[in-house]
């Protein structure tokens, strides 16, 4: 039977609710005048520096949040995750993405069995295969070495690996290792995405990685069949075994598809899709592109934060602090969104990955016991690298809705540039904005300041910035594979902390099921109409009208022959 105990019923939660009034009367201009407060609101680990002094919080706020963490049994929940307890209760599964990057000699159990040796078994297999592939020993159907990889997956099988790939592309060591190679991703079932993923590629030199745990994911398998047709039409049916491999646990369907089961790489049901980038889902395609040693550095970076998260006191624990502040902003100050603003173009795919990781994890309306929540959980996550975002949506952030911001900066650029005679280097120009924007949000600009600057009266209200808009700054020493892994792990654990405090299950995603079920009905109707001329039926009047309009136009792909992208 579901328990009615919710975190919002605790004295600690109610104490924070009462505390909101005091914070509402305080402006960040005044809070930032307290140098001791600013110094206290920092944390550092392995050169990663967090400054959260521009949050609408005081020392008292933080103490109350730490007490809320105690009431939520946060430490106990973290230990349960690392110990392999089945904290994903709706699916009766452990949550062990931390095992994917654990050292070889570590013991992490699920159902009483240490999973680390099995994880390393898959990693060793990936290492061996990637070395064979990259050396040119693995050749395609025509005897040519393969230099192009297309990874076919969707959701977590796509967004996480894409983020890491984009971040590594301009790292000097990774770029050198990837010379002469291409890694692309195919996710959307839209045929345009198929066309883009294979544009200018030669099937003779291309390897396709099909990522689907069950080998039944509708979009992924349709895309896989499409790329199979692309290969077979050019090289013949026997080429599939040399040009397609899989990340899956369903070896029967892998073999039926035409892929040699020896070339299938496993992952486990205790790895959620959005947490799977450190499994074969990400490690395999990334190792094919960059080499396993570089990917291992990425995994080691993630593992370093796992250790920090598990062992550091909450007061200096970066993921815990971030999670607590997010709960404060969402559930007490009422801010529904979060902007993720990396001042590094290499992190251009970070916000989309965190968008899925956060919103799929914490977009829940009931407690882990199935009790309807009386408070909001989760945020609307979005973002864009600086300074591009400044010329896009910062207007709203400065003078519209209040949206807490995560500013992520890097001390040492992957690609330093300086033009003789310029005032600053290109990276210093970028970082000038990184350091300025949080203060602009916090302090704002008053009518009095504008009057002193002789701004015309009719423009005073337009040029006034209220300020008092919260942000935090996360400064990384550099952006090598190691730091990329650290950044990923920080956000993974931050999001888990939020879920642990709210008392929800951050590791299931039942919300994606209904739409898929309804799409199945539409798919059957489209088939019946296209192939048998049957009228649209079984839908509400609006959907029926839309479907009828769609079907009234002659399809661009006749159903009596195979049609492939024209690229």
Curated annotation (Swiss-Prot):
What keywords tag this UniProt record?
A: Cytoplasm, Gluconeogenesis, Glycolysis, Isomerase
Which residues are annotated as active site? 360, 391, 516
Q: Which GO terms fall under biological process for this protein? A: gluconeogenesis; glucose 6-phosphate metabolic process; glycolytic process
Q: Does Metal-binding appear among the keywords?
A: no
GO CC terms, sorted: cytosol
| Binding site residues for D-glucose 6-phosphate | 156-157, 212-217, 356, 360, 391, 516
Describe which pathway this protein belongs to, using the record's wording.
Answer: Carbohydrate degradation; glycolysis; D-glyceraldehyde 3-phosphate and glycerone phosphate from D-glucose: step 2/4
- Name the Pfam families on file: PGI (PF00342)
Localization (cell): Cytoplasm
Which reaction equations make up its catalytic activity? alpha-D-glucose 6-phosphate = beta-D-fructose 6-phosphate
Its biological purpose: Catalyzes the conversion of glucose-6-phosphate to fructose-6-phosphate, the second step in glycolysis, and the reverse reaction during gluconeogenesis.
Q: How does it assemble?
A: Homodimer.
- Family classification: Belongs to the GPI family.
Q: What is this protein called?
A: Glucose-6-phosphate isomerase, cytosolic B
